[in-house]
Amino acid sequence: MRPFKQSKFSLVWTQNDPQPRMPIAHMRNQNIVPQLVPWKRVTYWRRLMNSVSAFRNGSSLNISRKLSMMRKRHTIYTRSTNGYSLRKSKVLSVGGSHLKWSKSIERDSRKANEEATLAVAAYSKKESEKQSGQNNTSTASRNHLARERVFRFGSLRYKMDSSRRTLQRISDVDSPCSGPSENGKGVKRPFIPKRLVIGNEEYVRFGNGNQLVRDPKKRTRVLANEKVRWSLHNARLRLAKKKKYCQFFTRFGKCNKDDGKCPYVHDPSKIAVCTKFLNGLCANANCKLTHKVIPERMPDCSYYLQGLCNNEACPYRHVHVNPIAPICDGFLKGYCSEGDECRKKHSYNCPVFEATGSCSQGLKCKLHHPKNQSKGRKRKRTNEPSQKNARRRYFSSLHNILSESEPMVFNRRSTDSEVFGMESLDFITLGTAEYEAGDDNDPATVQSISSDSESLISIYNLITPVALMQ
C-alpha cells in the first residue's frame, strides 16, 4: 500500500498527534479580502472571532472525546478547510504507518479472529479429550483388574473372568515347573483337585487342569435343597395347625368341615358345656354340647365372687379372680387347659356392658351382651329395697302397718299358730275390697274385730324375735 499523502485542502488528525496549531496560523496568515459593504465589516469580524474562540474551546474537546471513543480502531479523522467539521478519512493507522481502510480488511480481520477462536476451541477440546481418555483408560484398567481376580493353587495361578464362570490358568514362563529340568525330565505338576470351592461357588476341573469351570449342577442342587427346605417348612406348619383345636367344633359341637377336610383337631373331650343343662332346661337327648361338668369348661360362679354362694355342690368354678382381669381366650373357645389354676375370668358376657349397660365396640364386640337380663336385673334391684322394707316392717312391729292401712281382717277358720307361723298369709289383706264386700256390716262386728286385733297385737309384741330379724 502507498503511504497517505496529506491533502492540500484538508488537514489530517490522528489520535496520538499533539494539539494542532496549523489551522489557526493559516487563518491568521490568510488575507481576507473585504468584499462586503463597509458598514457590515464589524459584524463579519465579530462573527469570525467568535467562531475561532468556539473552535479553540469547544471543538477541541469534542474532537478529543470522539477520538477516545474510537481508540480501538485508530480511526483517522480529517478536518475541513475552515476547521468546523470532522469526517472519517477511511484510513487506518497500523504500526505508525497510515493504511487506507476498506471493507475487505475488516472482513479479513473478522475471519482471522474467528479462525483463531476456532483453533483455540479445537485445541482445548483435544486437550480435554486427551485427559478424559487417560482417565477412562485408568478407570478401565482398574475395573479390569477388579474384574479379573487371580487365585493361586500350589504353584499354579488361575485368573477368573468377569462372569465368574471359568478359571483360566496363567502361563508362567519363569516358573521352574513350566520348563524341563537340567536332566531333561519335566518337573511334575502340582496336584489340582477335581472340585474347588471358592466362596459359595464350586468349580470343576476339565482336562489337564488348565481351565476350571463353574459346576452347572450346583444351581440344580441349590434349587433342590430350597425345594426340600420349603416342603419341610410346610409340613411343620401343617403339624402345628393340627395341634390346634377347631374353634367351631369346640364351641358349638359341630363343624362344617367335619368330613376330614378341617386342618384342626376335633376332640370331643374339649367341647364346651351346655348352658341349658346347667340351668336344668336341656331336655335334648342328642345335644351336641357336653353335659359333663369339669373346671376347664365351667364359667365363674358370680355368687361365689360376691361371697354369697353356700352350695357345696355348685357346678360353677369357685376361684378368686381379680375384677379387672381379662377374659380367658381358651374359655371363650370352649376349653381352658389351666382349669382352676387360670387367673382370668371365665365368662361369656361383656364386663363393660354388664357394668355400664353399653359397650364402646358395639356390634364389633365378640362377647355376649345380655340385653334382657340387664333389664331384668335393673328391675329386680329397684324392687329389692321395697321388699326388704316390707319384711322388716312386717316382722318388727305391726303398729306401722295398722297406722298406714285399714284394720286387718282375719279368717275365722285360721288359728293363731297358723297366722304367726306365716302359713296362711294368703288370707291376710291390706286393702278395703274384702272388708267392704263382707257379709256383716254391723258396727258391733267391727268393734269385736278391733278388740280382737288389739289383743293379738299385744300377744305378738311379746313373742316377736326382733333381734334375729334385724
Swiss-Prot record:
Zinc finger (C3H1-type) stretch: 240-269, 273-294, 295-321, 322-349, 350-372
Enzyme Commission numbers on file: 3.1.-.-
Superkingdom of origin organism: Eukaryota
Keyword set includes DNA-binding: yes
One example GO MF annotation: zinc ion binding
Effect of residue 291 to Y: Loss of RNA binding and reduction of ribonuclease activity
Effect of residue 287 to S: Loss of RNA binding and reduction of ribonuclease activity
Region (Disordered): 122-144, 370-389
Impact when changing residue 262 to S: Loss of RNA binding and reduction of ribonuclease activity
Keyword entries, A-Z: DNA-binding, Hydrolase, Metal-binding, Nuclease, Repeat, RNA-binding, Zinc, Zinc-finger
Annotated Polar residues bias: 131-142
Listed SMART domains: ZnF_C3H1
Effect of residue 315 to T: No effect on RNA-binding and ribonuclease activities
EC class name: hydrolase
InterPro entries: Znf_CCCH (IPR000571)
Keyword Transport: no
Biased composition (Basic residues): 370-381
Function as written in the Swiss-Prot or TrEMBL entry: Possesses RNA-binding and ribonuclease activities in vitro.
Name listed for the protein in its UniProt record: Zinc finger CCCH domain-containing protein 7
Species of the source: Arabidopsis thaliana (Mouse-ear cress)
